[in-house]
Curated annotation (Swiss-Prot):
Its main location: nucleus. It comes from Drosophila melanogaster (Fruit fly). This is Broad-complex core protein isoform 6. Residues 135-185, 218-378, 425-601, 617-686 are annotated as: Disordered. GO terms for biological process: autophagy; cellular response to ecdysone; compound eye photoreceptor fate commitment; dendrite morphogenesis; dorsal appendage formation; eclosion; follicle cell of egg chamber development; gravitaxis. The lineage of its organism: Eukaryota, Metazoa, Ecdysozoa, Arthropoda, Hexapoda. It comes from the Eukaryota. SMART domains: BTB, ZnF_C2H2. Pfam families: BTB. Keywords: Developmental protein, DNA-binding, Metal-binding, Nucleus, Repeat, Zinc, Zinc-finger.
Length: 880
């Protein structure tokens, strides 16, 4: 072997493999270093690929020092941008007819190679240069180098791996081969059709020579492996194709192809499609030969039997390819095969389109646009090529191997128009010609500044957020009911069942408040303003289980209400019977359930006032009093929570006053003692029931805190925590006698300054009233027989009893009855005025229910006096 001999090693599928590698890296988001964003979505790509295919991106990215810039494009449709990126990585793309104009406009703005007018003009100029070169050198040898291929009968030099082919090249001193002045007719017709589709020239012979010379310049090193290596020239897994017939004995070579297409063919070629992919590609060989000798497939899964017409039996001289570099001819024209359904390109088949279109979370976004009808059309129509490249009659650039949109919910496209406006605020148009400005890694082409936006991480979530907002707006009434339902814990304990309070013969039904036996949950539920528990919900429940639970709770409420009605009726019948004291005390009637209805500061201190609607004897009054104690004891036993137990205990302590017991005992023989004294029926009525309530009210029992669970062993006061109990004992009971003590409220202070401040704030204007009501005749407790208020109320009771006695006797003088009535009315007016004029007593009375008791006392007294002397009592009551 001569020392001057060299060997050329060729990777047959080099271009397709490189483009496939770039696409695989993009699919895996490996080494991506730029993000294109528009309409709130983003696509990740490689800067080197974008720069190689677009001068616009090359200039923009060259001036950007950022490691991973984000380019925001305004007035660019995301579907067009996605199709452009697919075109850059594949070399071809399918575009819907409705989107073709906007796609070409976007490609022209971004100056994508192969799709712009400037690119077509450059291609025409290069072809003209090639034509002139071919005309000048077509009859002479183009190069002194020769390319020798072994005869088919002498075996193959192709290696077993199929990745390279061995060629021998002689030195410059070897004799030149004979010139080849012409080409076979079938290759000439093939190339003539290509040239005619590009520039529609009538010079067929010149086009043949030009295209053939162009092929020789770029493809002189291409060769076809011999028949001995069957199917070894391809590195893909394309489906099996019919074997070819025997080839000619002379060396064969394929015409070169210059497309920069990426084909999914290196290990995962899917089944071929039925449609021809004439796009911006040629025959798909990527300038590297067919890749097999007898073969299964070429570089992109195209059958070799369809390409027999493009093979030449004669050897070609090597051209000066190093001196001439042309733009790819097949970027703008097709091979125009007669059989339009035999050429297949597997780079955008259904499976891969499905993978790419569903990779919205992978950084490239999903193939979707604001026009839903574009997706629904199926993308089945053919598309015309731009007029500046070729006419629609000659070729259709974008055939309808449709994009696949698997499982795209139309609701996912909600809010897209709002995203257009949002993304429009982030960037300016790239048509301004500026290379862009860098703001924290965000490039805003054509503008001086913009808002930094993490488009690569945040923009993909806008559709789902807008959709969720709309769904929440539509279902807000239903969710409101569901929140109100789930905010309150449900339980089956009887203490939480709603009840309707009854007082006497009337019912106190409230539509805004639930009555739930004084629990925290009932208070929180009533504060929410939910509808009455007795009625059904107007809004449908979310699940069947919820309906079932509601029905069960409704049945429980009905049964509870029935039981309460029976108890209340039995209780009223027991009260009407004068001697019915032998039966055990029933459970508490429904009127006790209004502990939970009223606020804690307005708990009424009279719970047996309905007994006054009946005619009470001494035994009946005593029975009512005993029944009240039994009811309280039963309620304490049934109290389910510490709060309920505490308030029931507080209520029982308020009801057990010594003045009530004394007045009940003093009125025991009132009706049997005859007329003329306080022991008569009127005195029995007022002293046994009303005086008890007045005495309870005058004790000024303020409501206890909710969490009071620690009792002082000295004064019996309930405190919330051990620390407050300790401080209470230290300040109230363990201080020395000479410390500062308030003489009005008996509160102990640590310093005299604190005592003076306390008096100036709380007792400056209330001293006289406080001492008048609460400190009389050496007795300091309000409600005791020595206090002024108790004396006034006692005189009121005595006057009322005397008036009632005079009316019942009937033989007394009218003047005496009138005088007693006037005296009773005056006493009532004075007592009420004194009570209301005192700030401390008045406020405490309102807080503890005293005002209600006083007004009821005055109303009962007015009704009684109007029966005896209505003309005299009415002016006094008007004064009140």
């Amino acid at each position: 072997m001569d020392d001057t001999q060299h060997f050329c090693l060729r990777w047959n599928n080099y271009q397709s493999s490189i483009t496939s590698a770039f696409e695989n890296l993009r699919d895996d988001e490996a080494f991506v270093d730029v993000t294109l964003a528009c309409e709130g979505r983003s696509i990740k790509a490689h800067r080197v690929v974008l720069s190689a295919c677009s001068p616009y991106f090359r200039e923009l990215l060259k001036s950007t020092p950022c490691k991973h810039p984000v380019i925001l494009l305004q007035d660019v449709n995301f579907m067009d941008l996605h199709a452009l990126v697919e075109f850059i990585y594949h070399g071809e793309v399918n575009v819907h007819q409705k989107s073709l104009q906007s796609f070409l406009k976007t490609a022209e703005v971004l100056r994508v190679s192969g799709l712009t007018q400037q690119q077509a003009e450059d291609t025409h100029s290069h072809l003209a240069q090639i034509q002139n070169l071919a005309n000048s050198g077509g009859r002479t040898p183009l190069n002194t180098h020769t390319q020798s291929l072994p005869h088919p009968h002498h075996g193959s030099l192709h290696d077993d791996g199929g990745s390279s082919t061995l060629f021998s090249r002689q030195g410059a001193g070897s004799p030149p081969p004979t010139a080849v002045p012409s080409l076979p007719s079938h290759i000439n017709n093939q190339l003539l059709k290509r040239m005619a589709m590009m520039h529609r020239s009538s010079a067929a012979a010149a086009a043949e020579e030009t295209s053939h010379a162009f092929k020789r310049l770029r493809g002189s090193d291409n060769s076809l492996p011999l028949s001995g290596a069957v199917g070894s020239g391809s590195n893909n897994n394309s489906p099996d194709l019919p074997p070819l017939h025997a080839r000619s004995a002379s060396p064969q070579q394929t015409p070169a192809d210059f497309s920069t297409i990426k084909h999914h063919n290196n290990n995962n070629t899917p089944p071929l499609k039925e449609e021809k992919r004439n796009g911006p590609t040629g025959n798909g060989n990527s300038g590297n030969g067919n890749g097999n000798g007898n073969g299964a497939s070429n570089g992109n899964g195209i059958s070799i039997s369809d390409k027999l017409g493009s093979l030449t039996p004669s050897p070609l001289a090597r051209a000066g390819a190093d001196d001439v570099k042309s733009e790819p001819m097949d970027m703008v024209c097709s091979n125009n095969n007669a059989n339009a359904n035999d050429e297949h390109s597997n780079d955008s088949t259904g499976e891969h389109d499905a993978n790419r279109s569903s990779s919205g979370d992978g950084g490239k976004g999903s193939l979707s646009s604001g026009n839903d009808e574009e997706i629904g059309d199926g993308l089945a129509s053919h598309h015309a090529a731009p007029q500046f490249i070729m006419s629609p009659a000659e070729n259709k650039m974008f055939h309808a191997a449709a994009f696949n949109f698997p499982n795209i919910d139309p609701s996912a496209l909600l809010g897209l128009n709002t995203q257009l406006q949002q993304s429009g605020d982030l960037a300016v148009s790239p048509q301004g010609g500026s290379t862009g400005s860098l703001l924290s890694g965000v490039i805003v082409p054509g503008g001086s500044g913009g808002t930094p936006s993490n488009s690569s991480s945040n923009n993909n979530n806008n559709n789902s957020n807008n959709q969720q907002q709309k769904v929440e707006q539509q279902s807000s009434p239903h969710q409101l009911l569901q929140q109100q339902h789930h905010s309150t814990p449900h339980t089956n304990s009887p203490q939480l069942k709603q009840e309707q309070p009854k007082s006497g013969g009337g019912s106190c039904k409230s539509s805004d408040l639930h009555i739930a036996a004084g629990s925290e949950r009932s208070l929180s539920r009533s504060s929410q303003g939910m509808p009455d528990a007795g009625g059904h919900s107007a809004t449908p429940s979310p699940t069947a289980a919820y309906h079932k639970r509601e029905r069960e709770r409704e049945r429980e409420r009905e049964r509870e209400r029935e039981r309460e009605r029976e108890r209340s009726l039995d209780h009223e019948r027991d009260l009407e019977r004068p001697g019915g004291t032998g039966s055990p005390p029933p459970p508490p009637p429904s009127h006790h359930s209004h502990f939970g209805q009223h606020p804690l500061s307005l708990l009424p201190s009279h719970h047996q006032l309905h007994a006054t609607h009946h005619e009470l004897s001494a035994a009946a009054a005593h029975h009512a009093h005993a029944h009240a104690h039994a009811a309280h004891a039963h309620a304490l036993a049934r109290a389910g929570s510490p709060m309920e137990h505490h308030h029931l205990l507080h209520h029982r302590r308020a009801s057990l006053s010594p003045s009530g017991a004394v007045s009940s005992a003093s009125g025991a023989g009132g009706r049997g003692g005859g007329a003329g004294g306080p022991g008569g029926p009127g005195g029995s009525l007022l002293s046994s029931v009303r005086a008890q309530d007045v005495a309870q009210a005058n004790r000024l029992l303020l409501p206890l805190p909710l969490n009071a669970c620690h009792r002082c062993d000295v004064c019996g006061k309930l405190l919330s925590t051990k620390l407050t109990l300790k401080r209470h004992k230290e300040q109230q009971h363990l201080q020395p006698l000479n410390n500062a003590v308030c003489n009005l409220c008996h509160k102990v202070f640590r310093t005299l300054n604190s005592l003076n401040n306390h008096k100036s704030i709380y007792h400056r204007r209330q001293k006289n009233h406080h001492s008048y009501f609460h400190h009389g005749a050496g007795v300091s407790q309000a409600g005791s027989p020595g206090s002024r208020l108790h004396q006034s109320l006692s005189s009121l009771s005595a006057a009322a009893a005397a008036a009632n006695n005079s009316v019942n006797v009937g033989g007394g003088s009218v003047g005496g009855a009138g005088g007693n009535a006037v005296a009773a009315a005056a006493a009532a007016a004075a007592a009420a005025a004194e009570l209301l004029l005192s700030p401390i007593v008045g406020a405490a009375a309102v807080a503890g229910g005293t005002a209600s008791s006083t007004l009821q006392l005055a109303a009962a007294h007015q009704q009684q006096q109007q029966q005896s002397s209505p003309g005299i009592v009415k002016p006094c009551m008007d004064f009140l």
